[in-house]
């Protein structure tokens, strides 16, 4: 009996111990699962850094209670290369870093100065004012200042001469020159070629200069017109002009169709000068950002106008966060001035947004550290290595990819003369061949005429050319008729 009770007691004790062990293991596994990825625990002999950052898409974002984004991936790569552990904290006041009215620094710069953080890994612009109080590494991203707009608010209305837009001014000028040159060549070749004159009594040529102009214009509209060329040389020029006009019309129709289907690319606001001259849109930037101080310190008259506008209306046009700025652009007549690289992402993810072409104030995003920090040099070298190996480009493509980019049309632009250079060259070769053929035809007739009237071929050729180019009428007597008259 005692042995039986002792056996039962041992079994129960073993079961309880196993259950407690399994529960402890489950709790440890749960702890491992909820451990956020912004915390890399201290390891043996590894220094630990406190990293301050700011929530901004796609640099740092919250996903399922964890931080992710471009800067988080960059931080992981740097920690792996330099062998340090880190703890990420979001900046308390939600600001990047500027001097407050009291003379103290706010944002991430202030946290580094107060030693609340060791480094700042964020889209933090390298400026001279910040460089005076903290140190920056080599920039990991290059950017500038651009204008973010909503397409519907700045689409340019079609002008009265919108039909001329498919070709640039230079192309239209080249086309007009090609038309006039071709008609002149038609007229001259028809005069020089004996086959284009009606014989035997009175030679008559239907290719007057006006008829040549009409013939060229008819080809531009794909319409057959009279007179019809008879000489081989004239037909060469006519054929090459027809081919030229067919290819030209195809290019015009294709580009005009692209123009009509991508009218949103024709922006009324292309530059900051356009922005300050218009009155339809309000514009502003992030309060306390480096962009605001760029315009404040600039000596450029246009930049000063931008700053004065924002300073007078700072309570209304300056925004607190980047997300607020994008939302305001989408919902109201508002243009946001900020980092061009962030605007590219907004335009990629919101297909009704677009960035104006002009970008000013080239700058870079760097990692901020305390002055005289030993980590500044190490982090700079690591950033350069990541750039050389293409890892920074990989991160850029990873976090800036968007379906909107694949759907967007290619930017439209008028056709330049360079795009049609081969076409104009082909026309020039055809005109040259036509003139050469006319000279050959005239020389053949001169050779036959020289045998009948006992003169040299060169003299007959010269007389014929001068006669055909001098006569004002479109009819002339043949050599036989003129010879009888002289007799």
Swiss-Prot record:
Chain ranges on the Cytoplasmic side, renumbered to this chain: 191-235, 441-487
Chief subcellular location: membrane
SMART domains, sorted: Lig_chan-Glu_bd, PBPe
Family annotation (InterPro entries): Glu/Gly-bd, Iono_Glu_rcpt_met, Ionotropic_Glu_rcpt, Iontro_rcpt_C
Keywords: Cell membrane, Glycoprotein, Ion channel, Ion transport, Ligand-gated ion channel, Membrane, Postsynaptic cell membrane, Receptor, Signal, Synapse, Transmembrane, Transmembrane helix, Transport
One Gene Ontology cellular component annotation held by this UniProt entry: postsynaptic density membrane
Function, as annotated: Receptor for glutamate. L-glutamate acts as an excitatory neurotransmitter at many synapses in the central nervous system. The postsynaptic actions of Glu are mediated by a variety of receptors that are named according to their selective agonists.
Protein name: Probable glutamate receptor
Gene source species: Gallus gallus (Chicken)
